[in-house]
Regions:
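Terminal presequence/propeptide segments associated with secretion/organelle targeting
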Residues: 2, 16-674
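Sec-dependent N-terminal signal peptides
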Residues: 4-13
């Protein structure tokens, strides 16, 4: 990735100006986009999207479990999110005897809905710009404290936008009595698993259904049998009319992280160092876990959520690198920066300062990422930390220990430790005297790992109960890792570019860009705050001679169905429904066939955190549940290209079809108004 005169000539006109469907917009400022939205098929007003004076669509959107989105679809707090967003909760409720991951779960009444310990959802009350309050000397902590005192269950955050050029206060109501209502079998909800993840065409019924409960005053409350279904200010009406190519779509959700304004230095680090290293490390971890899961149903359940979490980013990073290379993102950044230099010679020092700051911090940030991908993944050391946590009572400590061992296998952890200690030893860019001494004492990283697991007495709950944690070899290891962690966590920021030494130059740089590039539509990077994105249903040209249509159907599921492959072994009930064409009201005529729609794609700008987001038509009605992007679209966190980037949506008609024909839970339809 070297700068060349040829590239500068070819790309001198390159800009990162607004493309038709690019952007993740703050809903409180959506009035600036309404004219464009209406020209593309939106029928409502800005007040319908976001209002603090009346119920609006924002009141039906939830931040689910701290990292996903969900949508409320009834007057009784029923909400839909992705299966992969509810996966941890479903897995925690599952046992070998009651395997809800494999078999699914469907409550047939409110009484059968299962409490999900620790699961929380947040509903936005309002957002306020507080840039001036901070400039006047008020602290973030003071602003948050005042906001949280306003109501029962209020939680607040102050988030920076445009690298600190603006700041907003977000006030939420936090609900922590959330119960599982329904989840399809994994071979529907995760159909295709890692093989199909980030891939189009897609046939995954990636949804799960929960319900929010509140106290008698409709306020957030801890779990109680006396709690009642929450009555939201607004819920989404469901449309079963379907979609066609060109239809308007809108996403309302909590995108987690984008890097729209990073420079070529950061793109080079991501594509050539960070992503390739993390991909290789996670490949090792997935191979170890996958081999163990094949040998034992118990291990498969224990490590199901862990495996899914590791695999998701692993495949995403692969697509990100491919997309960056395919679009020439690095070269475009170089050319854009050169245009900025030429147009703003008095501000060219900002790019020089950014480049110097990157050079100062790249090794430290790489070490943080290496620690996160290697040492952090060795689980047994957590027992040491729990045992030493003085904030816990004896009862709380034992409960935490029991929860840890519930989903732990010491033989799997041993293999992971061997692989990750060797990898850390190979790639480390910082000194680690304590760990290096342990390696040297036992004859190397692998030898030390084997010695550690041969001699620890913490390998199982039963062994733990009679062990002395303070003198156990795992404690010695945990202390050695803590030395590394203290250094690594100095660089624990969302992205490399958010390290203060780098970010301090981004604030004036982005401000200068906004003053200079008047053709570019600027929006704040995603940071897990509520955003609106809009686009249209559209296929795309995947490769030369290969056009991907925007809709998939049940026929694609049957073509992939394979009883010999776990991830494609669909429930027999679905085979039976297909064989008899017992589709009920969910059957449609499409391209001359009687079928059931499954998924579709659109041009909405999305990222992680948008999983589970409501996908709405021009009337603000729910037409699908967002759950993924196409593989090459994963680079849209850095560069969005409308010709290539597509988000993947589970058609709401397939959700309802599965609820009805597979789950037999049609009792939910009345409250959803279907």
């Amino acid at each position: 990735m070297k700068r060349t005169l040829l590239l500068l000539v070819l790309l001198c006109a390159t800009t990162f100006s607004a493309v038709a469907d690019k952007g993740m917009w703050l809903p409180s400022l959506i009035s600036s986009r309404i004219k464009d939205m209406k020209s593309k098929g939106f029928k409502l007003s800005a007040e319908d999207i976001y209002s603090i004076n009346q119920a609006s669509l924002k009141d039906a959107v939830v931040l689910f479990d701290g990292g996903c989105t969900g949508e409320i679809v009834s007057e009784q707090g029923l909400l839909i999110t992705n299966h992969h967003c509810g996966y941890d909760a479903i897995q925690a409720l599952s046992t070998v005897e009651n395997d809800y991951l494999t078999n699914g779960y469907w409550a047939m009444s409110n009484a059968e809905e299962l409490p999900c310990a620790g699961l929380k959802v947040h509903i936005l009350v309002r957002m306020d710009e507080v840039t001036d309050r901070l400039a006047a000397g008020e602290t973030r902590e003071e602003i948050i404290a005042k906001a949280e005192a306003e109501g029962v269950g209020y939680r607040a955050k102050v988030e920076s936008m445009y690298y600190g050029n603006q700041a907003y206060l977000f006030i939420y109501r936090e609900f922590n009595d959330v119960r599982l209502v329904g989840a399809p079998p994994t071979t529907i909800g995760k159909f295709g698993a890692d093989n199909d993840n980030w891939i189009w065409p897609r046939h995954t019924g990636d949804f799960s259904i929960f319900r929010i409960y509140a106290n008698e005053n409709n306020e957030p409350a801890a779990y109680s049998a006396d709690n009642k279904p929450y009555k939201p200010a607004r819920h989404f009406k469901i449309s079963t009319k379907g979609v066609k190519e060109g239809d308007f779509t809108m996403i309302y959700g909590f995108p987690g992280n984008t890097q729209e304004y990073i420079t070529s230095d950061a793109v080079e680090y991501i594509a050539e160092t960070s992503d390739p290293t993390k991909i290789a490390l996670r490949t090792e971890r997935l191979d170890i876990i996958g081999a163990a899961q094949k040998l034992s149903p118990e291990t498969r359940i224990k490590y199901a959520a862990k495996q899914a979490n590791i695999a998701n980013a692993w495949k995403k990073w692969q697509g990100e690198v491919k997309g960056i290379n395919r679009l020439g993102t690095y070269d475009k950044k170089v050319a854009y920066e050169e245009r900025f230099r030429q147009a703003n010679p008095d501000k060219a020092y900002l790019l020089d300062s950014l480049s110097a700051a990157y050079k100062r911090n790249i090794d430290g940030y790489f070490h943080y990422e290496l620690y996160s991908e290697t040492l952090r993944g060795i689980e047994l050391q957590q027992v040491v930390y729990i045992a030493a946590d003085e904030r816990l009572s004896d009862e709380e400590r034992m409960a935490a220990i029991e929860l840890f061992y519930k989903d732990f296998d010491v033989n799997v952890d041993r293999q992971l430790a061997i692989a990750m200690l060797k990898a850390y030893d190979q790639h480390a860019t910082a000194d680690a005297p304590m760990l290096e001494a342990l390696f040297e004492r036992e004859g190397g990283a692998e030898a030390y790992a084997n010695w550690l697991y041969d001699n620890t007495k913490l390998g199982s709950l039963e062994a733990y109960k009679s062990a002395c944690v303070e003198t156990d070899p795992m404690t010695e290891f945990a202390y050695a890792v803590s030395e590394i962690r203290l250094e690594a966590m100095k660089y624990a920021y969302r992205n490399l570019s958010n390290i203060p030494d780098i970010e301090r130059w981004f604030r004036p740089y982005v401000k200068a860009l906004m003053e200079w590039d008047k053709e570019r539509a600027f929006f704040p990077d995603a940071n897990l705050t509520l955003r609106v994105a809009y686009g249209k249903v559209a296929g795309y040209q995947y490769a030369d001679g290969e056009y991907h249509l925007p809709q998939t159907t049940i026929e694609g599921i049957m073509q992939k169905d394979n009883p010999d492959i776990y991830d494609y072994n669909i429930p027999q009930r679905l085979r039976d429904v297909y064989a008899t064409k017992d589709y009920g009201r969910w059957g449609i005529e499409l391209n001359g066939k009687y079928t059931v729609p499954v998924c579709f794609i659109a041009t909405n700008h999305t990222t992680g955190g948008n999983s589970g987001s409501p996908v709405l038509n021009g009337k603000g009605e729910l037409i699908g549940v967002n759950f993924d992007r196409t593989w090459l679209s994963t680079m849209s966190d850095i560069e969005f290209d409308e010709t290539l980037c597509r988000n993947i949506i589970c058609d709401i008609r397939y959700v309802l079809f599965v609820v009805d024909k597979v789950g037999g839970a049609g009792w939910l339809f009345e409250e959803m108004g279907i």
